[in-house]
Design a protein with these regions (language model features):
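Class I S-adenosyl-L-methionine
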Residues: 7-177
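Redox-cofactor binding/interface segments in oxidoreductases and associated redox assembly factors
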Residues: 1-2, 45
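Proline-centered helix-kink/hinge sites
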Residues: 4-5, 40, 89, 220, ...
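Short, conserved beta-strand segments within well-ordered enzyme catalytic domains
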Residues: 1, 10, 193
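Short, functionally important structural connectors and interaction interfaces within domains
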Residues: 1, 73, 78-80, 112, ...
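Short, small-residue-rich loop/turn micro-motifs
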Residues: 4-8, 101, 196, 220-221
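C-terminal target-recognition/interaction regions appended to catalytic cores
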Residues: 134-274
């Protein structure tokens, strides 16, 4: 199970190198190498949703072929899942690639969507209210200190609003349109990333705390994050939501329980994993 960073895939088609050959994707190649050496019954790989359509499907085709020929070979399938459909209060679309080793008579089925859709308010509204720069006794529930200018700007943005709510003379003239917005309390959160400092709480004038972001990602409160505030945000933003991972794991368990294994098809030319 893994999510190797694949920074090179976004530019690979423009620089004359294939996805596999791009040095920036060395950790992906290492993932394939480990699958070939260890030959697990199944593997799961998660990555950004854009991988499914990059270069009109050429990139994902290359990835599937790499796993199909790894070791004894794998039956590979992929799908783009939205975490909001699996008990996570967040619109987060990610590709999930699953392989079953050749010789195992089984099929993997992606989890069915759950009926309930959670809003951001559902999962963080019970936490203590904080003003800019305030702290609390709850681990990782510490509010960022904002400047007076930033507090003035965010004060104009309504629940679910954006930078267009800010008077023109104060409105940022450039920058990411996904910033200077306020969460919509009636919807799942926007996708959590490693930098959420300019997206505001739906009713409090501040950015979300690390604990609030962790709850949106579906981490339990007893999971404590360590590091600087930026490091913690990156840890949370780069994570796979635990509730989504759980639903996938249940399907993996079912596929393994139903699978009949032919050990004779194992690839015998294994090398030691260094």
């Amino acid at each position: 199970i893994g999510g190797p960073p694949c920074q090179g895939f976004s530019l690979a088609g423009n620089i004359g190198r294939s996805f596999i050959d791009d040095e920036r994707n060395r950790l992906f190649k290492e993932f394939v190498r480990l699958v070939a050496c260890v030959q697990p019954k199944m593997f799961v790989m998660e990555n950004v949703a854009a991988m499914a359509t990059h270069l009109k499907g050429k990139t994902i085709k290359t990835i599937v072929e790499a796993f199909e020929t790894a070791g004894c070979g794998y039956k590979v399938k992929y799908a783009v899942l939205n975490s909001a459909n699996y008990g996570v209060a967040q619109e987060r679309r990610r590709i999930v690639i699953v392989g079953i080793r050749s010789g195992i008579d089984s099929e993997f089925s992606y989890p069915e969507k759950l009926e309930k859709i959670y809003t951001i308010k559902d999962v963080i509204d019970d936490l203590p209210k904080l003003k800019s720069g305030e702290t609390s006794d709850i681990p990782n529930h510490v509010a960022m200190k904002h400047s007076a200018q930033m507090l003035e700007k965010m004060g104009y943005v309504k629940d679910g609003g954006n930078r267009m709510d800010i008077p023109e003379e104060l409105r940022p003239k450039s920058g990411d349109v996904r910033k200077y917005i306020r969460y919509d309390s009636a919807k799942p959160s926007v996708c959590v990333t490693g930098d959420m400092r300019k997206i505001f709480h739906y009713e409090q004038n501040r950015a979300l705390t690390a604990r609030e972001l962790a709850r949106i990602q579906s981490f339990p409160d007893d999971f404590i994050f360590e590091g600087t505030s930026i490091q913690i945000q990156q840890q949370i933003g780069n994570a796979v939501p635990p509730k989504l991972a759980y639903q996938i794991a249940l399907q993996v368990e079912e596929a393994l329980d139903n699978g009949k294994v032919s050990e004779g098809k194992l690839y015998r030319k294994q090398r030691e994993v260094s």
